């Protein structure tokens, strides 16, 4: 910690950001001093480093300095434990009781472990208490709640270790559970798995082992409605409901992360944790196939177990034709993001685009997709019979309607760092150009242009192989491992007997064409073999024509006249056979396949609450279902009622200066108001006391009041000089903050004017999928090189002066790109903020923006949903992709990776001007997703450690490719890879990054995923199955079966159950009833009462399920389930005893 280690240029960059931030805060403070905000100053404290964030988040004074001191001489985890001990002992901070000290200690330690970013230390731990063992000794009880999930398994587990470390330091005994308590934990965790979800579920014996031996009591608040059936009403467990926080910490924390806990226990030499060995031993017995059988990586089908309709499967596990693994990093991949060719995005029916999440087989669980056009695209068979590989997006659009089968979906680019992060064995690398060039350089000094080496002619490839013994170039290496010996021999025999090799006139050796008879090729099954090998060919004039065919012919052991020159070797390995027959070194083209299916679609959309709001002002039911303030101003509860008088729940306040009562933060006289506290039972004033002197209840300022809203509404319009011509201004029914005090109404009027919406804290936000970006070009950002120079970008990655729009430069760590849609929304927000400053606060405007180009260079705040710390950023450009591009460190500083996560941005001035803690909901999780602190400078040492595994090489070393063939653990070659972790504490931790694979346009590919553009779920399902039928690597009947079992059938069953248990709803006021009122109308407002679940919702997927089951021949068991559901639904909605008759039936007498 301490001073940031960076170059002078980076220091200038950081200083510039902080200077502009300081200037913005001065303007905001000046403005807030004049307005009606809860406080007259900006409420977001600034933090330069982790220590500042922890102190601001937890509120223990003096802790920041101590953390800096400890981190200078010990690891993050050790520092977290030690600071916890010192807080508990009273060395840092002062507390009224031992219990309070222990609670603060555990919160501080967890905040250090989670980089002071996530809300878990304040929201995930409800309280810490001291309990009594049966022998009279005390023990620590940590009450966890749902938001503890945001801390991650390791931090959850280490918080328990912190509790033990702290209790030892202050002399508290260990937890000694009773046997019925142990069994309660077993029942409760297994029940939680059924009603919620767990990443990992320990066995019953593992749960017993943890509870009996854990020195701290893992307790929690009830979070689920479900209750345990046995082991109820236990003396030391205060609820029968399921405690979600406890289940998460025990299962996903201690049980799953036991090896990491053990590592820290050993470091600290703590006794009493020997039982972890037993726990780890039990977990190892269930290890994956990769660990059990190092030399063979087996397919994993976990990613396709729960398929969702409309989200296609692109490849079944490790299946030929699926994604071919290619190692490397592009400037828009890594950090859990992977790359595919944008031509593949188009030919996969636009389901994948930039930012689309794919659930993948390995190395992790998911990855967000990015366009990388320097890797191979899909190979497809056209209706004409041609087999072509499509690498160019323009060609993809031209041929997409002609595609019959997607034989191979192309390469997927995954960097070494993702294998290291997931501790996944390195899978064998294909023989690619990056590897081949090492072999070429080691034996050949001949100067050949790189573009000729990347895409050589057949004659050049053969010359290099024959003259220098260089392995056959990847361009002419086919997928020999995808065919068996019989297919190889049949192909060899067919080419020898029926093929014709046509030498090209005046062309080099090997440039000829192989012609095969089409009809015989199809009849004898040779064409499918060519397709499996990815031997590209054209079909015309009754023949199959393979261009540059000599390398292929030689690999079959034939000569130029198609005579057998070498007999077939006795081997089952067809790659080895091709090498022996040709006399060249031939390596596997695609030894590793990766299965994938679509996860979430990409996101680029404004953030709204549900329902949407433009001002935090309560109007109860007076605004109707739309919460419209315009309607509320004209509301009358009855004929004789006053217009605009509404009954709402508000906090009563009074001015300490003039004594006037109010509902607002500031009195008309300019003084800030105080809550007017009274006892909710005795109705007496209670000032300056924590409880009522008569009954002992906690006082409150909140009451149901009759608010004369109309004059407040009119005055607000006058205050900002606007006319009352708006159709709708969206308020809220009820406030959620503790003091029930609203925002100034003027803000809502101006937001409605500019059509912007707020979140729970009063800020305007825009959500986008996270994609990493380490290098940029001006021509991709919608700006010029001159504008980039104004933003302090001086040179490209090769050290040349920045002069052209197409030069590649290294992205600075706090710079980001917005989608064009996001930029337009932020432009509207900027105009709103300026009007707010001028018309409401009576100060000068800040942005003066007329077009999105005027936003280039403005400061922003980035914030992730599960965190409580914003990060200062700078907007430098725009993208057509529906994503948010930013440096991996920027994403990591929000404790996010790029596996499909989405975060939000807000304008800095909007955040510091409008955010207030006083608006945050007074409920569990209310402080999550709020900028309680702002990180002003990103330190790579303090960001999420996953970012430390990003590799920064211009090309991977030869040793890397060799290590992949041995399926080594990635940690074994960590020292030869240039990782972020090796640069920490050096100026290069921010600069001089490189990448192995470039892309011509980071935003190439479809603008939106088909999942978002297709209409109904039925359309999406049809498109999903249509694509499954086209892809060779996908089993369409299996996809149909899985979708029925995991999506449609559970939906049908759930909707059927919901129909029979539903409540009624009034369409006017929204009141809900367990049963229909006898009058048929709402007793509250007289509105119509309707069902909340309709017959259409129940039947929604029935017909399509029957049709799909029939069309794809699903299992008889699944078909019978559909039939039973059909019978149940019919019996519920159809009365077979009643027959509908027409008038003619009655007249003819048939009605009798």
UniProtKB/Swiss-Prot annotation:
Catalytic activity: DNA(n) + a 2'-deoxyribonucleoside 5'-triphosphate = DNA(n+1) + diphosphate; Exonucleolytic cleavage in the 3'- to 5'-direction to yield nucleoside 5'-phosphates
Disulfide bonds listed in the record: none
Hydrolase in keyword set: yes
One record GO biological process: DNA-templated DNA replication
EC number: 2.7.7.7, 3.1.11.1
Keywords per UniProt: DNA replication, DNA-binding, DNA-directed DNA polymerase, Exonuclease, Hydrolase, Multifunctional enzyme, Nuclease, Nucleotidyltransferase, Transferase
Pfam family, one: PolC_DP2_N
Domain of life: Archaea
Molecular-function annotations in GO: DNA binding; DNA-directed DNA polymerase activity; single-stranded DNA 3'-5' DNA exonuclease activity
Transmembrane intervals: none
Function field: Possesses two activities: a DNA synthesis (polymerase) and an exonucleolytic activity that degrades single-stranded DNA in the 3'- to 5'-direction. Has a template-primer preference which is characteristic of a replicative DNA polymerase.
Summary of subunit composition and partner proteins: Heterodimer of a large subunit and a small subunit.
Protein family: Belongs to the archaeal DNA polymerase II family.
Protein name per its UniProtKB record: DNA polymerase II large subunit
Gene that this sequence comes from: polC
């Amino acid at each position: 910690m301490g001073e940031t280690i960076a170059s002078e240029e980076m220091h200038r960059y950081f200083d510039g950001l902080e200077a502009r931030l300081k200037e913005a805060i001065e303007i905001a403070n000046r403005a807030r001093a004049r307005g009606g905000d809860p406080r007259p100053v900006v409420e977001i404290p600034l933090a330069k480093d982790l220590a500042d964030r922890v102190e601001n988040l937890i509120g223990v004074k003096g802790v920041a300095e101590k953390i800096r001191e400890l981190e200078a001489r010990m690891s993050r985890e050790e520092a977290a434990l030690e600071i916890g001990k010192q807080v508990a002992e009273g060395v840092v901070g002062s507390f009224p009781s031992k219990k309070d000290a222990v609670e603060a200690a555990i919160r501080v330690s967890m905040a250090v472990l989670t980089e002071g970013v996530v809300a878990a230390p304040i929201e995930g731990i409800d309280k810490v208490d001291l309990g009594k063992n049966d022998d009279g000794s005390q023990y620590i009880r940590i009450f966890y709640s749902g938001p503890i999930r945001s801390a991650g398994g390791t931090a959850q587990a280490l918080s328990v270790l912190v509790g033990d470390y702290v209790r030892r330091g202050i002399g508290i005994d260990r937890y000694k559970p009773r046997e019925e308590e142990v069994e309660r934990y077993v029942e409760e965790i297994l029940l939680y798995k059924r009603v919620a979800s767990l990443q990992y579920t320990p066995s019953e014996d593992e749960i017993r082992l943890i509870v009996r031996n854990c020195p701290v009591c893992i307790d929690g608040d009830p979070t689920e409605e479900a209750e345990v059936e046995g082991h109820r009403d236990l003396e030391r467990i205060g609820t029968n409901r399921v405690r979600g926080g406890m289940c998460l910490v025990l299962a996903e924390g201690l049980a799953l992360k036991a090896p990491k806990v053990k590592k820290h226990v050993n470091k600290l030499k703590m006794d009493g944790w020997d039982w972890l060995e037993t726990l780890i031993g039990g977990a190892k017995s269930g290890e994956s196939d990769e660990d059990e059988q190092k030399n063979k990586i087996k397919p994993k089908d976990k990613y396709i177990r729960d398929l969702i309709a409309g989200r296609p499967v692109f490849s079944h596990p490790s299946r030929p034709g699926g994604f071919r693994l290619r190692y490397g990093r592009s400037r828009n991949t890594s950090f859990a993001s992977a790359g595919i060719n944008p031509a593949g995005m188009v030919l996969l029916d636009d389901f994948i685009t930039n930012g689309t999440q794919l659930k993948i087989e390995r190395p992790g669980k998911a990855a967000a997709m990015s366009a990388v056009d320097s890797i191979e695209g899909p190979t497809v068979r056209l209706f004409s019979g041609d087999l072509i590989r499509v690498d160019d997006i323009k060609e993809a659009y031209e041929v997409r309607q002609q595609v019959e089968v997607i034989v191979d979906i192309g390469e997927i680019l995954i960097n070494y760092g993702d294998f290291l992060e997931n501790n996944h064995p390195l899978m064998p690398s294909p023989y690619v150009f990056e590897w081949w060039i090492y072999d070429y350089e080691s034996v050949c000094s001949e100067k050949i242009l790189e573009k000729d080496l990347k895409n050589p002619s057949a004659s050049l490839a053969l010359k290099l192989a024959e003259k220098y013994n260089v392995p056959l170039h990847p361009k002419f290496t086919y997928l020999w491992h995808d065919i068996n010996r019989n297919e190889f021999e049949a192909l060899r025999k067919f080419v020898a007997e029926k093929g014709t090799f046509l030498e090209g006139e005046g062309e080099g050796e090997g440039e000829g064409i192989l012609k095969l008879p089409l009809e015989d090729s199809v009849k004898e099954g040779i064409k499918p073999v060519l397709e499996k090998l990815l031997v590209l060919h054209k079909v015309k004039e009754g023949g199959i024509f393979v261009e540059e065919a000599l390398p292929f012919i030689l690999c079959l052991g034939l000569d130029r006249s198609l005579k057998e020159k070498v007999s077939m070797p006795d081997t089952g390995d067809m790659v080895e056979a091709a090498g022996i027959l040709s006399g060249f070194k031939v390596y596997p083209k695609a030894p590793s396949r990766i299965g994938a299916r679509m996860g979430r679609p990409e996101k680029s959309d404004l953030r709204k609450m549900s329902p949407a709001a433009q001002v935090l002002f309560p109007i109860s039911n007076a605004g109707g279902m739309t919460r419209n303030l315009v309607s509320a101003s004209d509301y009358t509860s009855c004929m004789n009622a006053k217009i605009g008088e509404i009954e709402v729940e508000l906090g009563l306040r009074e001015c300490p200066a003039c004594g006037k009562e109010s509902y607002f933060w500031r009195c008309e006289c300019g003084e800030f108001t105080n809550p007017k506290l009274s006892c909710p039972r005795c109705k007496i004033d209670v000032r300056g006391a924590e409880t009522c002197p008569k009954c002992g209840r906690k006082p409150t300022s909140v009451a149901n009041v009759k608010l004369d809203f109309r004059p407040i509404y009119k005055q607000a319009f006058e205050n900002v000089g606007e006319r009352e011509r708006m159709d709708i201004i969206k308020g809220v029914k009820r406030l959620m903050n503790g003091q029930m005090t609203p925002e100034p109404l003027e803000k809502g009027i101006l937001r409605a004017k500019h059509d912007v919406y707020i979140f729970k804290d009063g800020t305007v936000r825009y959500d986008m999928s996270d994609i990493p970006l380490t290098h940029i070009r001006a021509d991709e950002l919608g700006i010029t090189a001159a504008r980039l120079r104004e933003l302090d970008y001086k040179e490209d990655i090769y050290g040349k002066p920045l002069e052209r729009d197409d030069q590649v430069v290294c992205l600075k760590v706090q710079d980001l790109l917005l989608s064009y849609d996001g930029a337009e929304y932020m432009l509207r927000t900027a105009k709103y903020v300026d009007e707010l400053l001028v018309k409401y606060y009576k100060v000068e405007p800040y942005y003066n923006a007329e077009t999105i180009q005027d936003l280039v260079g403005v400061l922003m705040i980035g914030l992730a949903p599960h965190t409580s710390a914003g990060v200062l950023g700078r907007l430098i450009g725009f993208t057509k992709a529906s994503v948010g591009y930013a440096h991996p460190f920027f994403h990591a500083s929000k404790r996010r990776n790029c596996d499909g996560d989405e975060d939000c941005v807000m304008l800095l001035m909007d955040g510091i001007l409008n955010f207030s803690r006083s608006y945050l909901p007074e409920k569990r999780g209310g402080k999550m997703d709020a900028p309680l602190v702002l990180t002003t400078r990103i330190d790579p040492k303090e960001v999420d450690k996953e970012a430390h595994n990003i590799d920064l090489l211009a090309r991977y070393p030869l040793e890397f490719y060799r290590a992949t063939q041995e399926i080594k653990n990635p940690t074994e070659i960590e020292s030869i890879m240039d990782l972020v972790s090796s640069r920490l504490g050096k100026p290069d931790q921010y600069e001089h990054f490189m990448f192995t694979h470039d892309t011509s346009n980071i935003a190439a590919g479809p603008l939106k995923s088909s999942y978002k553009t297709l209409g109904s779920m039925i359309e999406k399902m049809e498109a999903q199955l249509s694509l499954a039928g086209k892809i060779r690597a996908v089993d369409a009947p299996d996809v149909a079966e899985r979708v029925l079992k995991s999506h449609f059938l559970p939906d049908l069953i759930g909707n059927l159950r919901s129909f029979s248990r539903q409540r009624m709803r009034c369409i006017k006021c929204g009141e809900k009833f367990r049963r229909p009122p006898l009058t048929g109308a709402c007793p509250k407002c007289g509105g119509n009462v309707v069902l909340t679940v309709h017959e259409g919702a129940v039947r929604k997927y029935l017909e399509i399920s029957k049709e799909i089951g029939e069309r794809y021949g699903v299992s008889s068991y699944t078909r019978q389930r559909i039939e039973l559901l059909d019978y149940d639904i019919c019996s519920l909605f159809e009365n077979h005893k009643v027959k509908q008759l027409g008038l003619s039936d009655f007249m003819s007498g048939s009605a009798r």
